[in-house]
């Protein structure tokens, strides 16, 4: 009997504790859930596999729209912008840089010029001349949404096809020339050694052409002329190396080259 009573009492105590724990367990998850959702400092909210904040879907959709709206940038084309209406300081700004900065123009004679790399398409722009925004009346204009008059330029790929073709042709010609220089000339080839004949060893050198006998360094300089200046040489005398007669144990070498309309004669003195 004593054991039965003690078991009943201990069972009632355990039943009360179990009921108390069940009651506490029924309300605790709700409170913990409210704290986790309302508090951004609780790190467990990010560890739950099924928990997503309400703005996650909106952020993902916004990011997807942003990625879809990004398009590959078009090729920039060098475009010449010119201002011919005078002024001291001229700048330009337009839709190509979101009107954020003013690009200075360089003065060339009576005009102001700038070369800008603009993508293909239409662009609005305006000049900032001596502190005032103005447009060029000689160029196409358009009225913006704010009612201001801006210049309009249309950059088209077809306008640069000639330059692209010339650039491509230049690259191909340079590659061809390099390939021709590196390759051997056409013709038969063999491994036979050339045998010199006895009469070839004692053959006299070729006769010097008569037009190469008139070396300008051997000519007497006129008294009225500047001794540092030489007479204009004949075109057949260019790009030749001349050795003058040895005098006072000094050998003189000379060569004449032409640069456009100027002639330069170089002298090399070597003691012997």
UniProtKB/Swiss-Prot annotation:
Outcome when changing residue 235 to A: Results in an AMPK enzyme that is activable by phosphorylation but has significantly increased rate of dephosphorylation in phosphatase assays
Residues covered by region (Disordered): 1-52
Residue(s) carrying Phosphoserine: 39, 69, 95, 108, 158, 170, 174, 184
Signal peptide: none
Alphabetized SUPFAM superfamilies for the sequence: AMPKBI-like (SSF160219), E set domains (SSF81296)
GO cellular component: cytoplasm; cytosol; nucleoplasm; nucleotide-activated protein kinase complex; nucleus
InterPro entries (UniProt xref): AMPK1_CBM, ASC_dom, ASC_dom_sf, CRP1_MDG1_kinase, Ig-like_fold, Ig_E-set
Sites of Phosphothreonine modification: 40, 148
Post-translational events: Phosphorylated when associated with the catalytic subunit (PRKAA1 or PRKAA2). Phosphorylated by ULK1 and ULK2; leading to negatively regulate AMPK activity and suggesting the existence of a regulatory feedback loop between ULK1, ULK2 and AMPK.
An example Gene Ontology molecular-function term: protein kinase binding
Pfam name, any one: AMPKBI
Domain of life from the UniProt record: Eukaryota
Function: Non-catalytic subunit of AMP-activated protein kinase (AMPK), an energy sensor protein kinase that plays a key role in regulating cellular energy metabolism. In response to reduction of intracellular ATP levels, AMPK activates energy-producing pathways and inhibits energy-consuming processes: inhibits protein, carbohydrate and lipid biosynthesis, as well as cell growth and proliferation. AMPK acts via direct phosphorylation of metabolic enzymes, and by longer-term effects via phosphorylation of transcription regulators.
UniProt cross-references to PANTHER family, sorted A to Z: 5'-AMP-ACTIVATED PROTEIN KINASE , BETA SUBUNIT (PTHR10343), 5'-AMP-ACTIVATED PROTEIN KINASE SUBUNIT BETA-2 (PTHR10343:SF92)
Similarity comment: Belongs to the 5'-AMP-activated protein kinase beta subunit family.
Subunit (UniProt): AMPK is a heterotrimer of an alpha catalytic subunit (PRKAA1 or PRKAA2), a beta (PRKAB1 or PRKAB2) and a gamma non-catalytic subunits (PRKAG1, PRKAG2 or PRKAG3).
Protein name as annotated: 5'-AMP-activated protein kinase subunit beta-2
Organism: Homo sapiens
Lineage: Eukaryota, Metazoa, Chordata, Craniata, Vertebrata
Gene that this polypeptide is encoded by: PRKAB2
């Amino acid at each position: 009997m004593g054991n039965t009573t003690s078991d009943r009492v201990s069972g009632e105590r355990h039943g009360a504790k179990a009921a108390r724990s069940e009651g506490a367990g029924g309300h605790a998850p709700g409170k913990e859930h409210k704290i986790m959702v309302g508090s951004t400092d609780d790190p467990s909210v990010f560890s739950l596999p099924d928990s997503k904040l309400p703005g996650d879907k909106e952020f993902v959709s916004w990011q997807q729209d942003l990625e879809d709206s990004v398009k590959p940038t078009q090729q920039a084309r060098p475009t010449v912008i010119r201002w011919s209406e005078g002024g001291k300081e001229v700048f330009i700004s337009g839709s190509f840089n979101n009107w954020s900065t003013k690009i200075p123009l360089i003065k060339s004679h009576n005009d102001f010029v700038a070369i800008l790399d603009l993508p293909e398409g239409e662009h609005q722009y305006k000049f900032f001349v001596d502190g005032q925004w103005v447009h060029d009346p000689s160029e196409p204009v358009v009225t913006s949404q704010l009612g201001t008059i801006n210049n309009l330029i249309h950059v088209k790929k077809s306008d640069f096809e000639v330059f692209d073709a010339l650039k491509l042709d230049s690259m191909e010609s340079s590659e061809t020339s390099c390939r021709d220089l590196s390759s051997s000339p056409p013709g038969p080839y063999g491994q036979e050694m050339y045998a010199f004949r006895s009469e070839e060893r004692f053959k006299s050198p070729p006769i010097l052409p008569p037009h190469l006998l008139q070396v300008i360094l051997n000519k007497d300089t006129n008294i009225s002329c500047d001794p540092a200046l030489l007479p204009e040489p004949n075109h057949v005398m260019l790009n030749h190396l001349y050795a003058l007669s040895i005098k006072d144990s000094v050998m003189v070498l000379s060569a004449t080259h032409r640069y456009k309309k100027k002639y330069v004669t170089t002298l090399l003195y070597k003691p012997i």
